[in-house]
């Protein structure tokens, strides 16, 4: 009787052990939910999707990313808080869109050195100290750089003065455009086309690339040169979710994030292509003389850092040292 019982138990025990090992293996794979604060048809998402596919293809059994979508999944200005509270695990976002979480998020526009150097000189660690403490967020990687912002307008100007113009803004250039005497209007990117069409705004601020993704070229007459600041689009992650990752998962994610950042050379080429496309589309360039252009850029940074100092003096002082050339 004992012999028979053992014979029955042995296969059962083997099955239980196999199931246990299988469950253990599955437990080592984590799936992270990611949203984009930008529209899905835009260049930023289009650059992100192949990276997600690569992460998933190479990360089976370790880490997967589930892309939930753009603003239809989580509205643009709520994505930062969704990461902070853990509604989602990750977001592709820009600091200007989550100043409601912490004002320091907008300071990233003022970086004048590449992200690779930021990782070496302590800037990246300084960013994460603030993001961890104030945003319950881990700053993972910067995937867009070398994309200066520009003023786009339907009213021609011959000097850096936007008096009488209604300009769509985000926190990125609110202070600067107000210093140029603009009447500023805040609206999500998805509503700008209609605002231009109806004359609610005369122009807007945006990087050198991306206006074709939103069809804004159809309602835009002029671009003001030179550009200023540097468009920042980054991946962020809920801090508790980040800390929950195993060493293997965290190391794998970090490896893939560095691969993503290494592709940032794309943005300089893209900016050149977009400049040519704008000219072909009939957008005229407004240029100032050399002295005025230099003063224009200097004023942008002067105003930007002044605003940062008012909002968070200690952090701004630390960042200015690390972000400047």
From Swiss-Prot:
It is found in: Periplasm. Keywords: Periplasm, Signal, Transport. Phenylglyoxylate binds at residues 168-173. Its main location: periplasm. The keyword rRNA-binding does not apply. CDD domains: PBP2_TRAP_DctP1 (cd13667). Residues 1-27 form the signal peptide. Solute-binding protein that binds phenylglyoxylate (in vitro). Probably part of a tripartite ATP-independent periplasmic (TRAP) transport system that mediates solute transport into the cytoplasm. This is Solute-binding protein Bpro_4736. It comes from Polaromonas sp. (strain JS666 / ATCC BAA-500).
């Amino acid at each position: 009787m004992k012999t028979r019982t053992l014979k029955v138990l042995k296969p059962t025990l083997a099955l239980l052990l196999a199931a246990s090992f299988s469950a253990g293996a599955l437990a080592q794979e984590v799936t992270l939910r990611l949203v984009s604060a930008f529209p899905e048809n835009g260049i930023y998402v289009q650059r992100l999707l192949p990276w997600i596919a690569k992460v998933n293809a190479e990360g089976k059994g370790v880490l997967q990313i589930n892309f939930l979508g753009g603003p239809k999944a989580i509205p643009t200005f709520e994505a930062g808080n969704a990461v902070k509270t853990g509604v989602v695990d990750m977001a592709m976002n820009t600091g200007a869109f989550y100043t409601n979480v912490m004002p320091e998020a907008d300071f990233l526009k003022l970086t004048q050195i590449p992200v690779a150097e930021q990782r070496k000189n302590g800037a990246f660690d300084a960013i994460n100290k603030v993001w961890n403490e104030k945003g319950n967020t881990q700053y993972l990687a910067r995937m867009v750089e070398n994309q200066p912002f520009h003023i786009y307008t339907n009213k021609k100007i011959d000097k850096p003065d936007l008096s009488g113009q209604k300009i769509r803004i985000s926190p990125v250039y609110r202070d600067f455009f107000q210093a140029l005497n603009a009447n500023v209007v805040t609206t999500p990117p998805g509503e700008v086309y209609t605002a231009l069409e109806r004359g609610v705004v005369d122009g807007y601020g945006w990087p050198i690339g991306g206006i074709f993704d939103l069809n804004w070229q159809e309602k835009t007459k002029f671009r003001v040169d030179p550009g200023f600041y540097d468009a920042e689009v980054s991946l962020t992650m809920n801090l508790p979710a980040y800390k929950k990752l195993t060493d293997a998962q965290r190391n794998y994610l970090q490896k893939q994030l560095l691969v993503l950042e290494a592709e940032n050379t794309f943005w300089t080429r893209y900016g050149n292509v977009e400049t040519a496309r704008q000219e072909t589309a009939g957008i005229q360039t407004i240029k100032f003389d050399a002295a005025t252009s230099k003063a224009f850029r200097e004023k942008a940074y002067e105003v930007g850092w002044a605003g940062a100092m008012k909002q968070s003096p200690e952090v701004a002082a630390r960042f200015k040292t690390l972000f400047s050339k």
